[in-house]
Amino acid sequence: MPRLKTRREKRLRRHKRIRKKVFGTPERPRLCVYRSLNHFYAQIIDDTIGHTLVSASTLDPEFEKITGKRGGKSIKDAEVVAEIIARRALEKGIKKVVFDRGGFKYHGKIKAFADKCREMGLEF
């Protein structure tokens, strides 16, 4: 009898499938997102050398200055993280990225994050 798959297992399978196709280069690094139960994380990675170029999260001190709270799990908090990472990327001269949604469905916080990044000037 087949075992029921948990949400986490399904997400990890989607993530593996996406990672086979998505690869960050120096010209077009990978914008990777992770959504935990209480926080939202994003980083821009150059996969050729395996370095994180830019990162932001709801634990970032700049996030705390903007929102007045440490941590957050709402859609608005994901948009604030998008503003922070987009600004930092543009300061480093990164305009084009490949979006890696980390196996999460393109919905809710992930969609709001991506839309805000595009609005701030990042090209996917």
Curated annotation (Swiss-Prot):
Keyword terms of this UniProt record: Ribonucleoprotein, Ribosomal protein, RNA-binding, rRNA-binding
One GO BP annotation of this record: translation
GO MF entries: 5S rRNA binding; structural constituent of ribosome
InterPro entries in alphabetical order: Ribosomal_uL18_bac-type (IPR004389), Ribosomal_uL18_bac/euk (IPR005484)
Record flagged with keyword Ribonucleoprotein: yes
Pfam family membership, one: Ribosomal_L18p
Annotated Gene Ontology cellular component terms: cytosolic large ribosomal subunit
SS bond list: none
Top-level taxonomic group: Bacteria
The UniProt record lists the keyword Zinc: no
Family: Belongs to the universal ribosomal protein uL18 family.
Task of the protein: This is one of the proteins that bind and probably mediate the attachment of the 5S RNA into the large ribosomal subunit, where it forms part of the central protuberance.
UniProt subunit comment: Part of the 50S ribosomal subunit; part of the 5S rRNA/L5/L18/L25 subcomplex. Contacts the 5S and 23S rRNAs.
Protein name in the entry: Large ribosomal subunit protein uL18
Organism: Aquifex pyrophilus
Name of the gene this protein is made from: rplR
